[in-house]
Amino acid sequence: MMHLENTPTFHGFHMPAEWEPHSQCWIGWPERADNWRDGAVHAQLVFTRVAAAISRFEKVTVCASSAQWENARNQLPDHVRVVEISSNDSWFRDIGPTFVVRRETSKSDDAEHRIAGIDWTFNSWGGLEDGCYCDWSLDSLVKKKILDVERIPRFSHSMVLEGGSIHVDGEGTCITTEECLLNKNRNPHLSKSQIEDELKAYLGVRKVIWLPRGLYGDDDTNGHVDNMCCFVRPGAVLLSWTDDKTDPQYERSEEAYSLFSSVTDANGRKFEVIKLHVPGPLYMTEKEAAGVFQDDGAKPRLPGTRLAASYVNFYIANGAIIAPQFGDKKWDDEAIRVLSKTFPHHEVVGIEGSREIVLSGGNIHCITQQQPAI
């Protein structure tokens, strides 16, 4: 594996928008019983649905441990590649590499030198004191392993960052949240301006928009932006919304809406904000919590916990939107309607049973990682 010195922008790289063409999608395979209920059997069915749906539009590689490889291979469609890569859990948005690309700069450039991956530091969303589990040693190797398998050059970075904490428009703008990136459990030695400088140097952006907070109840990640809002095109965002003024989410949504109304992107465009209503609220049931093996190795899953359920947490595939469906028919149907109107040239595919993913802290965007086409 080639390790590149200096920063991605020094070499002419930038992070493309998620709607730009992909060569494939990377997904993990859930198995840990202290996070996924009933030994992850329900989650594995939903991960299989997600992988199968995405594989209609682009190649998919699923990474499973040696103990789970055969099980994953048997459940997944034959055309989905399954490779043996172990991880502590299956959140590939956060433990997978952030891919960056550059335009061809000389005749000597070949394809493999037009894409690279960023190997951010990972600390299980908060380290030993606040993180979701106490051993993340396997997660820390996933980026290196994927880049090695694909023979893609690697940039390493000592800054703690997860892929779900950033969104880019591919034209110079990044959105993140202060709740996550300025949390003392990530990079307490770095100031806001220093973190912003690193984002610019590694993602190739010129402007960083800081939302104060993420989705209410998204305590595992400390408010990742990918549960709160996302770009749908340059100058336009989808924002998690609620009309219920008694819901604590209302204040957060209004706060973000107000911010987007007062700023412009890197190219001076005002933002169009499209509201996407959250489901529920949804809460973990006694039965669901009882199915999680509680030990000292991971955060407990307790009955009555509000689930960080958001329709913004979808995946943009080549020509498709792979969107969560939580079993709340009113808002499930509304989400499909809004997404279909927002992405008129994409097929919107709803994944039934997405509640199984959010029970463990994330959703479809959190379990996927796109690899750009070059």
From Swiss-Prot:
It comes from Medicago truncatula. The active site is at 366 (amidino-cysteine intermediate). Agmatine binds at residues 220, 226. NCBIfam families: agmatine_aguA (TIGR03380), PRK13551.1 (NF010070). Pathway: Amine and polyamine biosynthesis; putrescine biosynthesis via agmatine pathway; N-carbamoylputrescine from agmatine: step 1/1. It holds the Pfam family PAD_porph. SUPFAM superfamilies: Pentein. Mediates the hydrolysis of agmatine into N-carbamoylputrescine in the arginine decarboxylase (ADC) pathway of putrescine biosynthesis, a basic polyamine. Forms homodimers. Keywords: Hydrolase, Polyamine biosynthesis. Its EC number is 3.5.3.12. GO terms for biological process: putrescine biosynthetic process from arginine. This is Agmatine deiminase. Belongs to the agmatine deiminase family. Transmembrane segments: none annotated. InterPro entries: Agmatine_deiminase (IPR017754), Peptidyl-Arg-deiminase_porph (IPR007466). The gene is AIH.
